[in-house]
Regions:
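Non-heme Fe(II)/2-oxoglutarate
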Residues: 2-113
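Catalytic core of non-heme Fe(II) oxygenases with the double-stranded beta-helix
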Residues: 94-211
Length: 211
């Protein structure tokens, strides 16, 4: 059995990404990995992180003309199992990247972190959408070291963020931020959106090589 040409990493009898031993990591990544450990406390929820004004600005960019749809997960045969719709290229008018980065550095007491992108993207999750168990930095992209999600609405059913190895299920409120390590200790899934539409601001941060 292989995952994207690698041996898979198995959690709860599911392939959740490449096996960690198959991926070469930089010393800076290893330093961060060892520093934070595998505590449940590394899953951080910050209530009311964004203001109504900031959320309204982001949601004003939910425009079908700028929507890009993509396959977010495939089965072992390469068939699409989940689609996400993104609204891309949003100008960071309110310095949201910096706000999130400052919070991450504070939460993990670690400074060598940078955002992967320079513009913001909103993900739309329609009813019926879900994301099966996976690990962010063991997937097709292996540099998604720290994911951050800001919830832009809460008027939907389902769509919980679940960390089964930590016995944790989260359905945040509008404006809340969630950050967590993207490594092997934090496999997670998004439960099916039962009704309504779920909107999130999804941002990834990386641990760059130290010069």
């Amino acid at each position: 059995m292989v995952y994207n040409n690698y041996m898979p990493y198995i959690v709860n009898n599911q392939s959740v990404g490449h096996h960690p031993n198959e991926i070469k990591r930089a010393p800076s990544y290893i330093e961060f990995f060892e520093k934070i450990g595998n505590s449940k406390e590394n899953i951080v929820v910050v209530s009311n992180f964004l203001s109504d004004k900031e959320i309204d600005y982001l949601m004003s960019h939910v425009d079908e003309k700028r929507m890009v749809s993509f396959v977010s997960q495939k089965d072992n045969e390469g068939n699409p199992t989940s689609w996400i719709h993104n609204y891309e290229g949003i100008i960071d008018k309110y310095n949201i990247f910096k706000k999130i980065l400052d919070q991450i550095k504070k939460s993990y007491n670690y400074q060598n972190i940078k955002p992967k992108y320079t513009s913001l993207n909103i993900a739309r999750w329609d009813a019926g959408t879900k994301l099966s168990l996976h690990v962010d930095d063991l997937g097709y992209l292996t540099e998604n070291h720290i994911p951050a999600l800001v919830y832009l609405n809460d008027d939907y059913e389902g769509g919980h963020l679940s960390f089964p190895t930590h016995n944790l299920n989260i359905k945040p409120k509008r404006g809340d931020l969630i950050i967590f390590p993207g490594n092997m200790h934090y496999p997670h899934e998004v439960k099916e959106v039962v009704s309504g539409t779920r909107y999130t601001l999804s941002v990834w941060f990386t641990i760059p090589d130290m010069l």
